[in-house]
């Protein structure tokens, strides 16, 4: 696509203005506060004009999006149903085995008292090797996407060290309601099992005391050996609630990923605008829930154009999705 002009809601453009300037993209923003008083379109000064030439090797993908004429008026969220392109970029996940292999040598000193290998940790036995795990695939994906650290999902192994992602961190990671509910359900199941396991251990210990009295001192050593050999296998599950990003990173390692902005020469977008005057020359538009009262009319007019690409927010972070779209048009 050459010299693309992208329409978007005014508040989305406002929140992204700094990143747009870094990309040397012009901004034509109609401020709805001022436009109420009859002011005309306000164009923010551009840092550097974008060269208006077509890019080689990339043809315009035209997805015909004309709505049937005769028509019913549509709301913001509906104007682009004819072309619904998911903007967000999900991070693919690998199997838990791969994550386990890659994390085995992390040696951050936070797990099982370990230094290097996972097997070096005190009590770090079983399939999990003593490393921290989470309860859902969604949480594992979110952590990998945000911090670049692969983390296993709990698979009913014992012993286990489980991270419970609490409310403030759930928001930070962008965990969905379904993901939160799934974690809550798994925690309830675990606590129920843990309670039953503790009861079984108490019964077994009582039985050992009776056996010791019955058989006397001669068999005391054998009973003690039995006790010490059986109890490590019954070491239960550690659940650690985590509210802050800092604590999470201290447990799993990694740092927050910050995407470097794509430069002007790498983006096809020349101008972003929320002005109805730019509908005629627009090549694409992005719609999302907005407080811009004029966007409904702009989007409706844009939807009447032939050969215009329509994109909509998938419900995640709107600014991130908007910039991702700009960088990949």
Swiss-Prot record:
GO molecular function, one term: structural molecule activity
InterPro entries: Orbi_VP6 (IPR001399)
Binding of ATP, residues: 110
Effect seen on changing residue 157 to N: No effect on ATP hydrolysis activity or ATP binding
Subcellular location: Virion
Positions with biased composition (Gly residues): 110-129
GO cellular component, one term: viral capsid
Role: ATP dependent RNA helicase essential for RNA packaging and viral transcription. Possesses ss- and dsRNA-binding capacity.
Protein name: Helicase VP6-A
